[in-house]
UniProtKB/Swiss-Prot annotation:
Complex and partners: Homodimer. Component of the mitochondrial transcription initiation complex, composed at least of TFB2M, TFAM and POLRMT. In this complex TFAM recruits POLRMT to the promoter whereas TFB2M induces structural changes in POLRMT to enable promoter opening and trapping of the DNA non-template strand. Interacts with mitochondrial RNA polymerase POLRMT. Interacts with TFAM.
Presence of the UniProt keyword Mitochondrion in the record: yes
Ligand binding (S-adenosyl-L-methionine): 75, 124, 150
Family in the record: Belongs to the class I-like SAM-binding methyltransferase superfamily. rRNA adenine N(6)-methyltransferase family. KsgA subfamily.
Transit peptide: 1-19
Name under which the protein is recorded: Dimethyladenosine transferase 2, mitochondrial
Induction details: By the nuclear respiratory factors NRF1 and NRF2/GABPB2 and PGC-1 coactivators.
Gene Ontology biological process terms from the UniProt entry: mitochondrial transcription; rRNA methylation; transcription initiation at mitochondrial promoter
GO cellular component terms, A-Z: mitochondrial matrix; mitochondrial nucleoid; mitochondrion
This protein's UniProt keywords: Methyltransferase, Mitochondrion, RNA-binding, rRNA processing, S-adenosyl-L-methionine, Transcription, Transcription regulation, Transferase, Transit peptide
Region Disordered, residue ranges: 44-64
Chain's gene name: TFB2M
Length: 396
């Protein structure tokens, strides 16, 4: 039995039409719990979950003026650049991948990569650096291409005309002659750079949505991303039930999606900081001074070939994200409490199938446990509907 999909958000409409996730819609103009057929009353609770909206990546909240807080970090130390070039290129016996370098700035790392034999596409968002970057590629037979583009603004969700440095990944990859390969194929290319200093979490969310939906850069295959990330966000990303205070939704999403490896650690002080006015010689803002005491971690994120299964697909991943957000929204609650709000299926039976007790807490569930939980619900045949949500709460 299939549900009507009128009024569903686009991603959920696709899920319903594809059969990946069956919903019982609860709302003022839809069936309520009391209208459900008796065979579907499987452990229902009195409350229904809010379907969490997709994050808006266009307008990040600001606590102060943009000019006073925005800054970028660049590799300007020659020795560090040579070290990173060796890390990115890997073993000499392997043919080098095409490298997409994000915001290379003054091009110290770019030059080291070229000297090591790499083929580089420099995606630079600041026009000031472009002439110098282009000069590095002279007499190199096309080993360097420089494009005015901000990697973190690829495929903006705002709609309308895309203006540089934002860009369409389809147009970018077509211009570079890069074709899509199957998900099970080898890594087609590498992306290297640094997450935005004031937008690491936001960038991780955008990439997560792109990866699980196989859109943007991930439409072309299992793109390897190598990024420097701040110490605090790194600790959260790698947290597990052993670190419950740091363990959160992105921990689960990324640990399931990718093999994550630390390639290098470097103090903040090893990088030069630039603002819109140029190099920042004497940072005085307390927030920045605190960051300078931390380390930056260079992490490698390679998407897993076995991420997608019959029951977790690019068509229903958004339901999985909703399950995680719902659970970590009340992280101290038991899993069974959340299940009673998320699905009309028998919550006790589901927990029994995945080998968990009724008193299992959210923060005690490992990433693979959440995936197993989701897939168990998806493949269940006990009820006509798999998931519950209240469409009247959707956009609140």
């Amino acid at each position: 039995m299939w549900i009507p999909v009128v009024g569903l958000p686009r991603r959920l409409r696709l899920s319903a039409l594809a059969g990946a996730g069956r919903f019982c819609i609860l709302g003022s103009e839809a069936a309520t719990r009391k209208h459900l057929p008796a065979r579907n009353h499987c452990g229902l609770s009195d409350s229904s979950p809010q379907l969490w909206p997709e994050p808006d990546f266009r307008n990040p909240p600001r606590k102060a003026s943009k000019a006073s807080l925005d800054f970028k970090r660049y590799v300007t130390d020659r020795r560090l650049a040579e070290t990173l070039a060796q890390i990115y290129l890997g073993k000499p016996s392997r043919p080098p991948h095409l490298l997409l370098e994000c915001n290379p700035g003054p091009g110290i790392l770019t030059q080291a990569l070229l000297e090591a034999g790499a083929k580089v596409v420099a995606l630079e968002s600041d026009k000031t650096f472009i002439p110098h970057l282009e000069s590095l590629g002279k007499n190199l037979d096309g080993k360097l291409r420089v494009i005015h583009c901000d990697f973190f603004k690829l495929d903006p969700r705002s709609g309308g005309v895309i203006k540089p440095p934002a860009m369409s990944s389809r147009g970018l990859f077509k211009n570079l002659g890069i074709e899509a390969v199957p998900w099970t194929a080898d890594i087609p290319l590498k992306v290297v750079g640094m997450f935005p200093s004031r937008g690491e979490k936001r960038a991780l969310w955008k990439l997560a949505y792109d990866l699980y939906s196989c859109t943007s850069i991930y439409k072309f295959g299992r793109i390897e991303v190598n990024m420097f990330i701040g110490e605090k966000e790194f600790q959260k990303l790698m947290a597990d039930p052993g670190n419950p205070d740091l363990y959160h939704v992105l921990s689960v999403i990324w640990q399931l999606a990718c093999e994550i490896k630390v390639l290098h650690m470097e103090p903040w002080s090893s990088f030069d900081i630039y603002t819109r006015k140029g190099p920042l010689e004497n940072p005085k803002r307390r927030e920045l001074l605190d960051q300078l005491q931390q380390k930056l971690y260079l992490i490698q994120m390679i998407p897993r070939q076995n991420l997608f299964t019959k029951n977790l697909t690019p068509m229903n991943y958004n339901i999985f994200f909703h399950l995680l957000k719902h659970c970590f929204g009340r992280r101290s609650a038991t899993v069974i409490d959340h299940l009673r709000s998320l699905t009309p299926l028998d919550a006790r039976d589901i927990l029994m199938q995945i080998g968990k007790q009724e008193d299992e807490k959210v923060v005690n569930m490992h990433p693979q446990d959440f995936k197993t939980l989701f897939e168990t619900i998806e493949r269940s045949k006990d009820c006509a509907y798999k998931w519950l949500y209240d469409e009247t709460l959707e956009d609140r």
